[in-house]
Amino acid sequence: MAKAAAFFAAVVMLFASCVSTNVDDGQQDNSVSEQTDSAKKQKTKKPKVKKKKFTQEAFDKAYAEGDYASCVAMLNGKKHGKDKILDALDTNMLMHLNGQYLDSARAFMETQWEMQQSANDTSGGKSFAATIAGENSTTYTGTVYERLLAYSMRAVNALALGDVGNAKGVVDTYAGDYKDVIAPLVAQEKALEAESENALETDDVSSALKSLQTVGVSVDLSSVNGGRPAKYTGKPYEHSAFLSYLGALIYAANNAPDHAQDSARLLREANPSISVLEDLAVPAGKGRLNVVALSGTIGKRCQAAQEFSTGIIPVLNTPLKFKIAYPAFPAQDHTISSVRVTLSDGTAKTATVIEDFDEAVKIDVAKKARGAYNRSVFRNITKNAATATVSITALIAADKAVKQSEGSIMMQIATQATYAATVAGLNAALNAIIKAEKADVRQGSYFPHKASAAGFTVNPGTYSVKVEYLSKDGSVIETKEQGDISVVAGKPTVVVSSCGK
């Protein structure tokens, strides 16, 4: 109850604080009473949710045209099932791309709460048990990198509103939440993978193999095991370079140098090539203008599938077929290659990549592929044992009846018909097992591909910024401009820009 109260209190604080679009010193322009009145209005007058009928074709068309409002409305009108959190993550990002920064910030906070509640109800063992029916039968609760991106996007939305005070609140919350939110999820994923590693050594598999042997099908697992993905031994993704970068800038903008240094240390651990020294040590009499650019959409995982033939089905003399499905991360082809930032004083820079989120997906897939493969083999064995054992027994009996059929022609025809129906039923059942086997490739689709930044040491004053999103050949894909940016001496001023192409 305490966590719930804290969460809804935070929502009210968000409504109250995200009202100024030109705040660079962490102070709110409104009085306390005005904030309270604003919060009450927000609390009593929730915006009406617009809904449209969802079709994939219409959604893809709207997205290609940059009609993010229609995309949001279609996701709101979609039946979510076990993908409620997944659809919420996409909706929240699309609201950001549509410039609905306050709505997006609030929605990300609510989604984080739902993600945590779902995760609290799940353990590694429960997840393994839930996947017996199929990988996609489980409720989607989000990945570690999506949890971290949710914090980042809340901070980005606050910065887009010019509210560095609320942005500080977000990074403060992350620092306090890590042990209770991120660390348990990491432990839960490790527990699932550990249980999956031993999936083929369980009593369920041993019993299933024995059942198949009783009807003459001997399964050779050596060929199946040969295609198993390697166990991931690389560095786990437990911290975000981008979130640490934002933390360093936000704390510096809020006159919290010690916390800024803590974030800078985490940034060095996540991405040693990035330095925020110039951002944290602004020369006397100078200001610092940092332009953060989110470009493209995050790379997508796909299904990898391997088919194996093992054992021989009696009577039919055909092999038993397995389909093993698991996630993979193929080479990606992104539209935006780089970002160029130009200030109104003519200064220009190519933005430095702070984080490529494809790497987070790649790590997530590599960590999960082996466990998913083992669970897929588990399902193939146990489902075939449950289905094929009965059907093969019936097939053997029907074949015997055909060979021994005597009597009238009608009786022989009936026996032949029974045999044919048994064969058809067996084939249909085996094909259904193969058709049902699918990898879980769910993920948020509209998070950015890259977070980049360009920092400028400038004289205090008012500036405008032009952000150009460039293709591999240097041609401009899209240009975003912002004006009336006030830069003060001694601290960073942060501007954010996004392009989802």
Task: For the regions a language model picked out, list residue spans one by one.
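C-terminal motif of bacterial Sec signal peptides marking the signal peptidase cleavage site
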Residues: F15-S17
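Bacterial signal peptide processing site
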Residues: V19-N22
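Generic helix N-cap/helix-start motif at coil->alpha-helix transitions
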Residues: K48-T55, K82-D87, T111, E146-L149, ...
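Alpha-helical segment of the N-proximal tetratricopeptide repeat
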Residues: K50-M74, D90
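Short coil/linker segments at helix-helix boundaries
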Residues: N98-R147, Y151, L161-S244, A253
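Short loop/turn and low-complexity linker motifs enriched in small/turn-promoting residues
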Residues: G285-K501
